[in-house]
């Protein structure tokens, strides 16, 4: 949510996106959240057992929700792997994605043409982090750096599952407060950049015509769930 919400806000009309988001949050998001808490506290069963208790024929809903959670876990753990990769790369100075790579041909320094046409961050993302092939017909080799980061991410998940819910309670104070510290650092850094005020005005200036676009409401509903 932290990295996706600003992107959706900028994509879907800035401040105008907050209107469908808040409407759907009040009408759908918060009621479903409290309904889930109430049902779980009253019946005291898991996702599958709750629906089987309500009606045995509805047990498939519980299985479906577990499958959805599985796919969501696979999707987000890849993002965690990317984050781990960038975490270790960020200890370098200068940052590897701050400048285009330069190759030397004798005494002549040549900037990578592909990077020069796009940007240093885009080049690093596609060529260093993802290590994608030149075309879809080429499968490419194993990206061992990203594979190791993904294994580390799944190792963390495995340790959390084995230790149980009590282990997560021990780090709850850190995990709940540290993201806000990081966001505060990002806020200060963003405000110190050149053109920060123009960017903020562009992001939060409402584009009311966007509210008539069904895709905006769809993105808002997806963000809530």
Curated annotation (Swiss-Prot):
Glycans are attached at residue 105. It is found in: Cytoplasmic vesicle, Secretory vesicle, Synaptic vesicle membrane; Postsynapse; Presynapse. GO terms for molecular function: symporter activity. InterPro entries: Na/ntran_symport (IPR000175), SNS_sf (IPR037272). Pfam families: SNF. Belongs to the sodium:neurotransmitter symporter (SNF) (TC 2.A.22) family. Keywords: Amino-acid transport, Cell projection, Cytoplasmic vesicle, Glycoprotein, Ion transport, Membrane, Neurotransmitter transport, Sodium, Sodium transport, Symport, Synapse, Transmembrane, Transmembrane helix, Transport. This is Sodium-dependent neutral amino acid transporter SLC6A17. It comes from the Eukaryota. GO terms for cellular component: cell projection; membrane; postsynapse; synaptic vesicle; synaptic vesicle membrane. The keyword Ion transport applies. The lineage of its organism: Eukaryota, Metazoa, Chordata, Craniata, Vertebrata. SUPFAM superfamilies: SNF-like. The chain crosses the membrane at residues 1-8, 16-35, 60-80, 144-162, 171-188, 224-225. Residues 81-143 are extracellular. It catalyses: L-proline(in) + Na(+)(in) = L-proline(out) + Na(+)(out); L-leucine(in) + Na(+)(in) = L-leucine(out) + Na(+)(out); glycine(in) + Na(+)(in) = glycine(out) + Na(+)(out); L-alanine(in) + Na(+)(in) = L-alanine(out) + Na(+)(out).
